[in-house]
């Protein structure tokens, strides 16, 4: 098989050696792969910049990335576990939101709070760092601003770095950092595609992606991506309408200078969303089960979100091998919602609801509530850094250094009212026909501003031809001002990684970084928990083949933390349902991950991964047992050599048993979801050179499963279908 190799000197070199690993996998898993087109003796040289993000538009892998260190490298050179979800995989698997991407990414698990809110975890800890083009946004789970609903039509790929990522983000849990890479205007000719999709629950989706030069020489280019989606749901009364748009201009201002500037808009309007799930427990300790269509949302409930972002990137090359990059962004995310939740136990005799605080006395027998919440999150961020190579002791090395500043303001308002048993009546007869609250004026619920200033640097030193050392550090000044208190912290996060090249295809690595994470969680008295501190260690083995078209990673990790927030399962007294947490010291998460991703042959793409970890506190108690300790995820596509117009594929996601023990007035109950697998299928037929039809089936066997054993019952998505027509020009 012909390919090129991205080497350690940031150059592309032609190679004609076939991939032994790819051949072995192909022969073992699919004998027909042996009949793929044979290699020829002709050498093909691919010219391109070392910063080219992708060497195959139809691959599940990419050639190089700056994830983890901001230095452009192959994944094999990064001493951490990295997963990249490419545009082709998102199209094959119909991963249309950030949440859907994370659900199908190795090592990431989900806890679904209701119809639209979900928390995502890796290695046992919540993911709280979400970046766009390397600029982070921090969000709180209490407020639903639609982060996981970001539409992937606007993005080229998603990069996931697992473990602590303090060198990139300054603060954060040792879970993972998610970076969404925007689409850019890369074509000097007019090109594009339009698609229409129709599916289960009256889904309709239309997307256009167009590129065009704005000048005759193509040095100024534009790209517009726009779309509209409307769908109902398996949940009664639910409807979602989404509009999204991105416009970007990329300009070559000279031979050494490029400028990108753009605007992003997303609007998501949801009618009758749920706020929490269905009551799990009866008063006798038995658990409930419901039809998956059952919803606690009344007809008048809604949750509307609007996202506006402007952004720019300026790049300047200098001194032959150096480049300075300035990223800037301003984003505003607004939401407005009126919803209803039920938090109660069911009396099996008559279906009447009993509140969790009924034994506190009169006035405490409420069984839920209604809330009118609104607010805005504003983020202003700048990031300036330079990276390049230098020579020392006769060897080439790499250096990156820079600084960043971000200001994030969260300002939210709320009005709420309690619901009492007689207002609902028997829950067995509840159908969402509930009168809208006579709302009181909203009051200020939260107003806080977080400032973060950082200086960072890292160098990749070639100690010997096969041995590379990465050293780095990030100094962070973090300050938050809230309605009730102010806090300022200074922290330096060290980073060290060692990579040893075993041969042309295999490397082994070790890495270390510290952990620093201020927390927004509060204890039962309403006080904020102290920052999380700790250490992250990782050892691994990586390989890449065919110019990184196929990559593998085997990683062993150990995470040590103090002051980790763990849910108590009860709300903070006097709060609007906010869960109380306790700080747990001596928390250790340790485990192993394996991933294979990319092209097995020119016709066969495969991503396969498995994760196993254990997370315990210093007393041996499981931390977050509501998260699966073992997961396996696989997705593949295969283009038939005998009928190259036809591509078939599918995948499976499996997780082991999860549970949560909940203390109630009636005793301690255990909520449990056994292990289960979800199977998906897809096929695509290239009808003409420009037009294709694709069909997808998700949850093929219509598995019923609970996505949130930590709280009320929230069922996962039932079996669903879609068909998509795409025209390229």
Curated annotation (Swiss-Prot):
Residues 1-36 form the signal peptide. It is found in: Cell outer membrane. Keywords: Cell outer membrane, Ion transport, Iron, Iron transport, Membrane, Receptor, Signal, TonB box, Transmembrane, Transmembrane beta strand, Transport. Changing residue 163 to A/V/N/D/H: Impaired transport and growth. Changing residue 46 to P: Abolishes transport activity. Residues 60-72 have a biased composition (Polar residues). GO terms for cellular component: cell outer membrane; membrane; transmembrane transporter complex. This is Hydroxamate siderophore receptor FhuE. It comes from Escherichia coli (strain K12). The lineage of its organism: Bacteria, Pseudomonadati, Pseudomonadota, Gammaproteobacteria, Enterobacterales. The gene is fhuE.
């Amino acid at each position: 098989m012909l390919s090129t190799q991205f080497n350690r000197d940031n150059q592309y070199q032609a190679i004609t050696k076939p991939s032994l690993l790819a051949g072995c996998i192909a022969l073992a898993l699919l004998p027909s792969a042996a009949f793929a087109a044979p290699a020829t003796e002709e050498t093909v040289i691919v010219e391109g910049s070392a910063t080219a993000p992708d060497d195959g538009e139809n691959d599940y892998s990419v050639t190089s990335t700056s994830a983890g260190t901001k230095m452009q490298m192959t994944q094999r050179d990064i001493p951490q576990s990295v997963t990249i979800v490419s545009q082709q995989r998102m199209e094959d698997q119909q991963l249309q939101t950030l949440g859907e991407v994370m659900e199908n990414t190795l090592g990431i698990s989900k806890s679904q709070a209701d119809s639209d809110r979900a928390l995502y975890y890796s290695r046992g800890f919540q993911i709280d760092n979400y970046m766009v083009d390397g600029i982070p946004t921090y969000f709180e789970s209490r407020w639903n601003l639609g982060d996981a609903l970001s539409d992937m039509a606007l993005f080229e790929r998603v990069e996931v770095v697992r473990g602590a990522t303090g060198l990139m983000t300054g603060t954060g849990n040792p879970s993972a950092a998610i970076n969404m890479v925007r689409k850019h205007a890369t074509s000097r000719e007019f090109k594009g595609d339009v698609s229409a999709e129709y599916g289960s629950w009256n889904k309709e989706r239309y997307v256009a992606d167009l590129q065009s030069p704005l000048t005759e020489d193509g040095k100024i280019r534009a790209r517009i991506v726009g779309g509209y989606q409307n769908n109902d749901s398996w949940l009664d009364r639910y409807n979602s309408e989404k509009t999204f748009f991105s416009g970007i201009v990329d300009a070559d201002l000279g031979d050494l200078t490029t400028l990108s500037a753009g605007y992003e808009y997303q609007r998501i309007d949801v009618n009758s969303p749920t706020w929490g799930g269905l009551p799990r427990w009866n008063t006798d300790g038995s658990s409930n089960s419901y039809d998956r269509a059952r919803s606690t949302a009344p007809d008048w409930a809604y949750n509307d979100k609007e996202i506006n972002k402007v952004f720019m990137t300026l790049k300047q090359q200098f001194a032959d091998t150096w480049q300075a990059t300035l990223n800037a962004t301003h984003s505003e995310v607004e939401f407005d919602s009126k919803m209803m939740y039920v938090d109660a136990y069911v009396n099996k005799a008559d279906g009447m609801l009993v509140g969790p605080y009924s034994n506190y006395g009169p006035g405490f027998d409420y069984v839920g509530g209604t809330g009118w919440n609104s607010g805005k999150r504003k983020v202003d961020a700048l990031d300036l850094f330079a990276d390049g190579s230098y020579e020392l002791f006769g060897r080439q090395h790499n250096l990156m250094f820079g600084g960043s500043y971000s200001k994030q303001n969260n300002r939210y308002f709320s009005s709420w009212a309690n619901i009492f048993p007689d207002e609902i009546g028997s829950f067995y007869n509840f159908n969402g026909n509930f009168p809208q609250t006579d709302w009181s004026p909203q009051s200020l619920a939260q107003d806080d501003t977080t400032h973060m200033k950082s200086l960072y640097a890292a160098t990749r030193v070639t100690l010997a031809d096969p041995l590379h050392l990465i050293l780095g550090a990030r100094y962070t000044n973090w300050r938050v001002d809230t309605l009730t208190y102010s806090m300022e912290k200074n922290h330096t996060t060290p980073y060290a990684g060692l990579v040893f090249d075993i041969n042309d295809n295999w490397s082994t690595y070790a890495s270390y970084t510290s952990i620093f994470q201020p927390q927004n969680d509060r204890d039962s008295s309403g006080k904020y928990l102290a920052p999380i501190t700790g250490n992250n260690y990782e050892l691994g083995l990586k390989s890449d083949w065919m110019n990184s078209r196929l990559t593998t990673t085997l990683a062993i990790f150990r995470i040590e933390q103090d002051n980790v927030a763990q849910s108590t399962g009860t709300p903070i007294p006097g709060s609007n349902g906010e869960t109380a947490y306790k700080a747990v010291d001596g928390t250790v998460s340790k485990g192993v991950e394996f991933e294979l991703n990319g092209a097995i042959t020119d016709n066969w793409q495969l991503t396969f991964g498995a994760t196993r970890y254990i997370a315990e506190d210093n007393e041996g108690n499981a931390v977050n047992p509501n998260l699966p300790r073992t997961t396996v995820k696989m997705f593949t596509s295969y283009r038939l050599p005998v009928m190259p117009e036809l591509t078939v594929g599918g995948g499976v996601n499996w997780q082991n048993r999860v549970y949560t023990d909940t203390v109630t007035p009636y005793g301690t109950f255990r909520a449990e979801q056994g292990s289960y697998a979800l199977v998906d299928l897809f096929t695509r037929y290239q009808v003409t050179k420009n037009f294709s039809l694709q069909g997808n089936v998700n949850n093929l066997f219509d598995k019923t499963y609970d996505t949130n054993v930590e709280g009320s019952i929230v069922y996962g998505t039932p079996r669903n279908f879609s068909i998509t027509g795409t025209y390229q020009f």
